[in-house]
């Protein structure tokens, strides 16, 4: 009877290590489509912010200058209002309007300073469209009553408490005021 030679042992060990390595690589690549990728969220947040600031809420001819009427209607229609025909979106869910999978959460908010010229120490606040005065006010202001036709310029679930969110910001002009369009994806 012939015993196992060193060469037989080496060939067996190489085959074993090769099979184990193949299994680990195959399982990792088979599972990767089901794991989240923060880089994908970054691309999504930037794409949504660009689409909103440059097209849906304004005009491609004048990007980052938001149409007051369509911007107000965008937030109002997602909270039960109707969509005007002249605006560049349809009456769908937020995710459908911005082209994001239902498996991702999206929050769109417009923040800014409504007290006067911005300074380095200002903290932007969430904005509200006051329908009776036809002007922007702080969402926390007593002049913002969403039950009487005023529109809170925020839509989507609140990301507070989420472990990881990706945020894209765009400097925009709304109703003659500087504001910041904030898109959060998680």
Question: Which residue ranges define each predicted feature?
Answer:
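Long, compositionally biased, intrinsically disordered regions
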Residues: 27-186
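N-terminal single-pass transmembrane signal-anchor helix
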Residues: 1-27
């Amino acid at each position: 009877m012939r015993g196992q030679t060193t060469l037989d042992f080496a060939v067996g060990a190489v085959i074993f290590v090769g099979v184990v390595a193949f299994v680990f690589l195959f399982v990792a690549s088979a599972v990767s489509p089901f794991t989240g990728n923060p880089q994908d969220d970054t691309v999504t947040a930037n794409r949504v912010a660009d689409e909103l600031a440059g097209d849906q809420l304004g005009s491609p001819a004048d990007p980052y200058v938001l149409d007051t009427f369509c911007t107000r209607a965008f937030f109002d229609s997602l909270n039960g209002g109707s969509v005007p025909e002249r605006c560049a979106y349809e009456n769908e869910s937020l995710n459908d309007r911005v082209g994001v999978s239902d498996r991702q959460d999206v929050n769109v908010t417009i923040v800014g300073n409504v007290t006067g010229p911005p300074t380095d120490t200002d903290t932007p606040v969430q904005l509200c469209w006051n329908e009776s005065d036809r002007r922007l006010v702080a969402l926390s202001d007593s002049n913002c009553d969403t039950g009487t036709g005023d529109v809170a310029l925020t839509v989507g679930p609140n990301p507070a408490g989420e472990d990881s969110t990706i945020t894209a910001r765009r400097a925009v002009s709304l109703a003659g005021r500087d504001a910041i369009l904030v898109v959060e994806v998680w």
